[in-house]
Amino acid sequence: MEDAHAKKWEEVVDYFGVDPERGLALEQVKKNQEKYGPNELPAEEGKSLLTLILEQFDDLLVKILLLAAIISLVLALFEEHDDEAEQLTAYVEPFVILLILIANAVVGVWQEKNAESAIEALKEYEPEMGKVIRADKTGIQKIKARDLVPGDIVEISVGDKIPADLRLISILSTTLRIDQSILTGESVSVIKHTDPVPDPRAVNQDKKNMLFSGTNVSAGKARGVVMGTGLNTAIGSIRTQMFETEEMKTPLQQKLDEFGEQLSKVISVICVAVWAINIGHFNDPAHGGSWIKGAIYYFKIAVALAVAAIPEGLPAVITTCLALGTRRMAKKNAIVRSLPSVETLGCTSVICSDKTGTLTTNQMSVSRMFVFKDIPDDAAPELYQFELTGSTYEPIGETFMQGQKINAADYDAVKEITTICMMCNDSAIDFNEYKQAFEKVGEATETALIVLGEKLNPYNLSKAGKDRRSAALVVREDMDTRWKKEFTLEFSRDRKSMSSYCVPLKAGLLSNGPKMFVKGAPEGVLDRCTHVRVGTKKVPMTPAIMDKILEVTRAYGTGRDTLRCLALATIDDPMDPKDMDIIDSTKFVKYEQNCTFVGVVGMLDPPRKEVLDAIERCRAAGIRVIVITGDNKATAEAICRRIGVFGEDENTEGMAYTGREFDDLSVEGQRDAVARSRLFARVEPFHKSKIVEYLQGMGEISAMTGDGVNDAPALKKAEIGIAMGSGTAVAKSAAEMVLADDNFSTIVAAVEEGRAIYNNMKQFIRYLISSNIGEVVSIFLTAALGLPEALIPVQLLWVNLVTDGLPATALGFNPPDLDIMNKPPRRADEGLITGWLFFRYMAIGTYVGAATVGAAAHWFMMSPTGPGLNFYQLSHHLQCTPENEYFEGIDCEIFSDPHPMTMALSVLVTIEMLNAINSLSENQSLLVMPPWSNIWLISAICLSMTLHFVILYVEILSTVFQICPLTLTEWIVVLKISFPVLLLDEVLKFVARKYTDEFSFIK
């Protein structure tokens, strides 16, 4: 049934053909069960483990590595080996590659399994049982909630979880209050009624006659007819939205995917080229004159080239850097659930923030109040107007009047204000030892009045020597010695007030007999006020006094303050309780007559004190903050002015919309509104998702905050979903990040950390890529020039994973730039490598490759311990035979000597260490940013060199890597060949500082 909230309950009951007193007949129940299905959310069909594992290998770089491993394994199995050491070496390469791929897959599967929990977490809001009236049995019967069908008559009472979406048909108590915060984000429980809500487009917050599945009954008892079950409930539609939301890759993941595609194409071309260049050498004597053996030999070189070109250490280094970033964020109260989102934070351009609890404390607090000072006969009434500080439930704050700090106990009317706040109240504050914070017990507005009374402390009670909890309750405990509450007349919609009947326990200024203390909406209470309290006197109410009260109350409720106002009053001579019918709430208004007005208090959910600075930092960082709230527009605008989202006198036209106003716009109008607006008020969950969609369409990277079940679809859809630590399990499961302290300024700190991490990641990604270019150039040169192998695959794997991996990880500890939050966010499509940088790394890579090959050639041609070959002999080494006159007097076994390979590997490792020092800064000279500015990098370089010495000088390892120890003379040659890379990069950095080229190569 559409728009049940807009129809009379009798129409709804008729639609289902149900008698509200007897319920559905069994035939109707069966028919509806067949038609609508069970009242439960379908279980999530997760991907099988095999599917998840296979998905991890659906990546070009991974496929190339896998192919390289398989080919290496096949060659190792079928090739003849001279000795056991050579055979072991042949198997090391495929084994290590497979180990890397398996580790990568395990991490990926674990992350995906975690992400699937969001939809399952919704199940916790499904109630297990429901109380139903059905024609087959008399009275109320308890059944499983899953067996409820549309048309069932359900009874609910305090403490129950609503078992399905219901249309109220009768309220069986004075009032019915529902806590629907998980669904609508409202911070206070909502009073429900049975009257139609004539607006067919009403948002869930305004459907006061509807009860939603999964929400809780705070007070009262009622009956309703089931309107929706399973997926046809409000919570079911949220499940559908979450199910339909596709996971998006982060900007970095997209960049790396594109980089992988480009790299795979380049690798394919180079591998084919190397193989093709050497077709003429397939028949060389070294291959036994066999064309097939020669083809396989050069095929192995092509495989080695593929291994050299892929930065195998990159996934591990990125994961390590992100994991370290999450640890730093956790110290700032930002708990990251999804590793890739750490980097995404760095390019966040829009933060869509919930108001309640994120920008504000979600702890109602009285900030202003007034009482009468004097009412002269011939002049306007005079007021005492008080301002109070403190924005939490801890009763610490000061009282000011006209900017001057005062002692509230000096004013007689304050004693009466405090008495009404304390006695006409069913709530309290409690100290949570675990959180070391004060919390409300009961209603937020009533708790604010309790805190006000404790702050005012009108009898100057001493708090000395008391702990935090005891000091916060001194006024409450003192009040209990002065007054005894006999009964309460609960709040009702018709009179918009509540009252308590109290008797004095000891004599005092106010306690000269029983009194009724009244609080409620100003217009409702003032209509029943005949007098006004001025100090300790009672003055008759006049139209002028009434106008003054309404004028100041309106000022409190509008403009910058937009406070929620309550009028406080007393009845000095109440009716005898024997004459009151305290069961029938329709008569309460008769008992609350002849009131004496005492004062008005104005309260709000106050902004967090650190938010103003955080918003300013966002503005400096080029990040737009959009406030999205279920609260009304006026209140939201007032808070936005206080925290700096809007200026004090800024016109908000075109920059603030309600959900209804947004819906009324055309698609183009909605897009423009999202592009400009800074506030969306009175919105529903689907509005949040729609706003995220528009932002994504504009190329913005959005962070979305939320805490309720209703926020989960938008949290899942946004690039960064941010849940509150105090939020629901569903919101936390759907989010990438959880704020332990629910604080907006924590988001800004996390964005700063994200930017720093991205900058460092750029440095080590570029470092690793330039290293791989050097390795590719090295293999290409040896193959193209016909030189002996300078590096073999197992050595390349060692360099890529261990020797390069450690300094690359250490580059993640580079200190952040001081002006990191004074720059606009980077574009999501910004390239990892610009054209100029590509040229730089090609220049460095070419030097690395040439130096590596040169080191091996140096040993063959110029070393005192080498054979002293000429270039022709070196480049035609495969033609070496005892009969060949060009190789007369040369032992052909010399080409298998481990020395030249050791020289090449040592030069490669040393150059990479110097290259890591170059990567401390993209453009800054080492004279400005010396190596010791990152002590972790120095440690990593020392460790890498130590590991290199280990494989050189530990015999079993040197056998595996086919290398040997070097002499001091040979090490001096290694350093001479390696050192110029520092000078080369310094020259390139100097050119970059003078003439920067911004066009992007990898987009």
Swiss-Prot record:
It is found in: Sarcoplasmic reticulum membrane. Residues 79-89, 283-300, 800-840, 918-934 are extracellular. The active site is at 354 (4-aspartylphosphate intermediate). The chain crosses the membrane at residues 60-78, 90-110, 263-282, 301-318, 776-799, 841-863, 899-917, 935-954. SMART domains: Cation_ATPase_N. It is an enzyme of class 7 (translocase). ATP binds at residue 519. GO terms for cellular component: sarcoplasmic reticulum membrane. GO terms for molecular function: ATP binding; ATP hydrolysis activity; P-type calcium transporter activity. Residues 1-59, 111-262, 319-775, 864-898, 955-1003 are cytoplasmic. Its EC number is 7.2.2.10. Keywords: ATP-binding, Calcium, Calcium transport, Ion transport, Magnesium, Membrane, Nucleotide-binding, Phosphoprotein, Sarcoplasmic reticulum, Translocase, Transmembrane, Transmembrane helix, Transport. It catalyses: Ca(2+)(in) + ATP + H2O = Ca(2+)(out) + ADP + phosphate + H(+). It is a multi-pass membrane protein. Pfam families: Cation_ATPase, Cation_ATPase_C, Cation_ATPase_N, E1-E2_ATPase, Hydrolase. This magnesium-dependent enzyme catalyzes the hydrolysis of ATP coupled with the transport of the calcium. Belongs to the cation transport ATPase (P-type) (TC 3.A.3) family. This is Calcium-transporting ATPase sarcoplasmic/endoplasmic reticulum type.
